[in-house]
Design a protein with these regions (language model features):
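Intrinsically disordered, low-complexity terminal regions
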Residues: 1-242
Length: 242
């Protein structure tokens, strides 16, 4: 399918696999392996639609130009995106999501892990059972899991994280604000040097470990970060990292 400057692909399948690969500029190619006779691929403007009415398994491979918008709705299909995309939205009952980079990210799953190298803009991920692991988040993020770990290598925007029974780790926090909650997990945060920390933290049966004060001869702070943490039976550790 030849497409214009704002292409998108919407995929609906009950089970199977969805794979997005790098393709040629201005061209979207879709290959479908399914026994569902109602499954079809259609086009509406620059939007390519691939779905079936009766459910069933379908393995869908998309070759698309970079920064295309991808939307997937599935009951139990894994989603793998190997090329940078613009907006990535995935709604599933169970299934893992793996991606390279996305301009914006939104995922919702009852059971599944989310892994990606980076999100340039906003990210919103909700899963009942599964880890959330993302390299770099460039803007605001809202991440929630009931029984999984949340691991972010770097966040440059406001970050809100909640986990009932998992650990929360932010390798380097440079955004202005972090709100973190966990019932039976710990929180570990890295902050850059020359950061003024505004901390509001509480834990019922855990420990709080903070970096040493810079001292009177230290250089003035370059940024201020507000951190609010609520824990029940977990530890909080904050380190200074380069």
């Amino acid at each position: 399918f030849p497409v214009g400057d704002s292409p998108s692909v919407k995929i609906g399948t009950r089970s199977g696999r969805v794979r997005v690969e790098a393709g040629e500029p201005g061209i979207v190619r879709i290959q479908v392996d399914t026994r569902n006779p109602t499954f079809e691929v259609t086009r509406r403007g620059d939007a390519i639609l691939a779905s079936g009415e009766r459910g069933g398994r379908a393995d869908v491979t998309v070759q698309a130009p970079s920064m295309i918008d991808i939307e997937v709705s599935t009951a139990s299909a894994d989603v793998e995106v190997l090329t940078p995309v613009g907006r990535l939205e995935v709604a599933s009952a169970s299934g893992d999501v793996a991606f390279d980079t996305a301009g914006r990210l939104q995922t919702k799953s009852a059971s599944g892990t989310v892994r990606g190298n980076g999100v340039e803009g906003e990210a919103r991920c909700i899963t009942a059972s599964g880890d959330i692991r993302i390299g770099v988040i460039g803007d605001r993020a809202d991440l929630s899991t009931a029984s999984g770990d949340v691991v972010i290598e770097q966040c440059r925007g406001e970050l809100s994280v909640a986990s009932l029974s998992g650990d929360i780790r932010v390798g380097q926090l440079t955004g202005p604000e972090l709100n973190a909650k966990s019932v039976s997990g710990g929180v570990r945060i890295g902050i850059p040097p020359r950061t003024r920390l505004d901390l509001d933290a509480s834990t019922l049966s855990g420990k709080v470990s903070l970096p040493p004060s810079p001292g009177p001869s230290a250089e003035p702070p370059e940024r201020e970060i507000s951190v609010k943490v609520r824990l029940v039976s977990g530890n909080l550790r904050i380190d200074r990292v380069d």
